Amino acid sequence: PCLGLSRADGLELRAMVARGPVRVRMSAECRDEWRPLRQAVGRVPSGTGSLEFAILGGHMDSWFGQAASDNAAGNAIFLELARVFQRHAPELRRGLTVGFWVGHETGTMIGSSHFVDRFWDDLRENAVAYLQIDQPALVGTTLWETKSDVELHDFHAAVERRVLGGISAYWGR
């Protein structure tokens, strides 16, 4: 478990610790309940009438303090990709679905799970790929991580060599 505190409280605590040992007692209340949430999902249809589609997914929620990189930067990339794909919609052989999931940072992944539960039949029949971008554009990044299934390992390695030009990358699944 972790508890967040304000910057002012953190600075005060740091100053106290600098003067000597400190005992702190903190308490928190956490509500774990179901409630309605809005989840933005956009679709760009294929130009061929194909029902197949790729999914771009990312999360809207964030921890306090890290929202610019986790995941506002990823969502900005999705918005730009959706804009470009929409411009070229008549040429697309497959459609594109862009999902901005809620409930990600709680550890439950409830937004994306709800989407899968609700649209399972369509996903099973027509979804061909899923791409999630989370925490891009971090200044000073020296390690890139790609996760997928083992069938795509060689493909990812080739793309990473070409795009990253020798920067180390980690692949996992």
Residue ranges and their predicted role:
Residues 1-12, 17, 49-50, 101-173:
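Metal-dependent peptidase/peptidase-like ectodomains
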Residues 1-69, 79-95, 117:
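Soluble metallo-hydrolase cores and metallopeptidase-like ectodomains found primarily
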Residues 63, 70, 103-107:
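Glycine-/small-residue-rich active-site loops that bind phosphorylated ligands and cofactors
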Residues 97-99:
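A structural signal for isolated positions on well-ordered beta-strands in alpha/beta enzyme cores
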Residues 71-72, 113:
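"Short basic amphipathic alpha-helical interaction patches in structured regions
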Residues 66-70, 142-145:
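Short, solvent-exposed loop/turn segments at secondary-structure boundaries
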Residues 74-78:
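Alpha-helical transmembrane segments that form the membrane-embedded catalytic/substrate-binding core
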